[in-house]
């Protein structure tokens, strides 16, 4: 992997032909990418769960506002493990900065703060993550499974989930509805 092919803080946009149900029409935010592989969170597949449901399961008291925060299917790996993508704010016990504008946290303290309305302004809560072994992501990109573009905080945190796939591709000037699912190499 060269420095120019590091996809940390990038969106991975599934091509229309990618039919794996875990990634069909997905946008994945890449949290870490190095010579050992990559880790990301799918940001446009909300589940039927809300933050309130997760907090209740963890015996953390919350109010009705937590029922308004969706929980996303972050990927097929460790689907019982929670991840919070958020704007940098607070000092959580298990945070990893991804970029100047985004951190990922896996500790209970951020959820407790969110239940008290003391958490970060921008959040995306997910269960599970997407993972790739060494060289796997690079090969999938070379095989036309994915497009990549620098992450955008509005798409990540504010745009409705059902608009994120097209919006991320539009950052590249691509209209995914015009691309065949059978794309290949010329």
UniProtKB/Swiss-Prot annotation:
<protein>
    <recommendedName>
        <fullName>UPF0301 protein Tgr7_2910</fullName>
    </recommendedName>
</protein>
<dbReference type="Pfam" id="PF02622">
    <property type="entry name" value="DUF179"/>
</dbReference>
<dbReference type="InterPro" id="IPR003774">
    <property type="entry name" value="AlgH-like"/>
</dbReference>
<comment type="similarity">
    <text>Belongs to the UPF0301 (AlgH) family.</text>
</comment>
<dbReference type="GO" id="GO:0005829">
    <property type="term" value="C:cytosol"/>
</dbReference>
